[in-house]
Design a protein with these regions (language model features):
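Flexible, low-complexity junctional segments that flank or bridge functional domains
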Residues: 1-132, 139-141, 288
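Sec-exported extracytoplasmic/periplasmic mature domains
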Residues: 19-22, 125-129, 153-160, 200, ...
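Extracytoplasmic/secreted envelope proteins and their assembly/folding machinery
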Residues: 117-124, 148-152, 192, 204-208, ...
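Extended C-terminal subregions enriched in glycine
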Residues: 191-213, 218-226
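Low-complexity, Gly/Ser/Thr/Pro-rich intrinsically disordered linker/tail segments
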Residues: 260-290
């Protein structure tokens, strides 16, 4: 655990980090996190390629260690925590779940499905009156985009636009883009926390994109699945006339200088914590910030 000071990153004993072997940019390595007590801290975060073949539900050990050098001449060798994918089923027979965590309303639904649109819209309207609320997308694998737009309409009482542009290369055309050259921000006096995890995919990632233009929104958890637009596109090969399906028929373009999303890597959260602990730690952080 580290804190960021005017002198740089310091560990729990007050020792200042001067370098980490192999990582010259400390600000790129150290990410905001939340301590067990609910305070903002920093941890080094590394992303590694993973196989999603069923073993992602098992615990995995990162084989890379970090050697940290301090100003007093001492060193530490850090080993990453084990990792496994998080998914939480809804209560039996329910499409949605609106619960309370330390007095904060938390809304979970695992699909953007128009068949229970009234439930999602009703929860959004109820959450719009709360000073702090959480939208739990850690187990949401996507669905219909219009459900996401309606959710934000009910929550913020206005249209919320995304920041990026989706562009189809088969054939070349815009799929979705802001209605103006400069995407308008949506005002929001309350705090909306969006919980993210590696199961957050497709429309759940579009929802996170929308949240970037909503005031006082905060993404807490892990990087997402990275499959917002990697749908397959049907094409015909010009010479053989064979019909094939190819992925990446659509590309997602972020504003120049921003790299918050990348296909197969996902969205980066504002605050990195294990998905399983995100709801509890977010509630503790909000309590400490009162």
């Amino acid at each position: 655990m580290f804190v960021k000071t005017d002198s740089g990153y310091q560990d729990s004993k007050g020792k200042t980090v001067v370098s980490v072997d192999g990582y010259p940019d400390l600000d790129a390595l150290f990410k905001r996190s939340i301590s067990k007590e609910g305070y903002l801290v920093y941890y080094p975060v590394l992303l590694k390629e993973a196989k999603f073949d069923g073993t992602e539900w098992d615990k995995h050990v990162c084989d890379e260690q970090l050697t940290v050098h301090y100003a007093d001449g001492s060193t530490d060798v850090l080993t990453a925590d084990t990792w496994s994918q998080y998914y939480k089923d809804l209560p039996k027979g329910q499409n949605t779940d609106l619960r309370q965590t330390d007095g904060i309303p938390v809304f979970q639904f695992n699909h953007f499905d128009p068949s229970f649109l009234e439930e999602t819209n009703a929860a959004a309207a109820q959450m719009s009156n709360a000073e702090i609320s959480m939208l739990d997308l850690r187990s949401n694998v996507g669905g219909y985009e219009e459900v996401a737009h309606q959710w934000f309409n009910r929550y913020s009482h206005q249209r919320v636009f995304g920041t990026g542009v989706r562009y189809s290369v088969l054939p070349a055309s815009l799929v979705a883009s802001p209605s103006t050259s400069k995407t308008p921000r949506a005002s929001n006096d309350n705090i909306l926390i969006l919980l993210s995890g590696k199961c957050s995919a497709s429309c759940a990632e579009i929802t996170l994109d929308l949240s970037y233009n909503l005031d006082n929104s905060l993404i807490i958890g892990e990087n997402t699945n990275g499959s917002m637009i990697s749908n397959s596109g049907h094409i015909e090969l010009p010479n053989s006339k064979c019909s094939v399906d190819m992925t990446f028929s659509t590309v997602y373009l972020t504003p120049d200088g921003f790299d918050y999303f990348e296909e197969l890597r996902g969205f980066f959260p504002d605050i990195w914590v294990p998905a399983k602990e995100a709801e509890t730690l977010a509630a503790k952080l909000m309590e400490n910030l009162k």
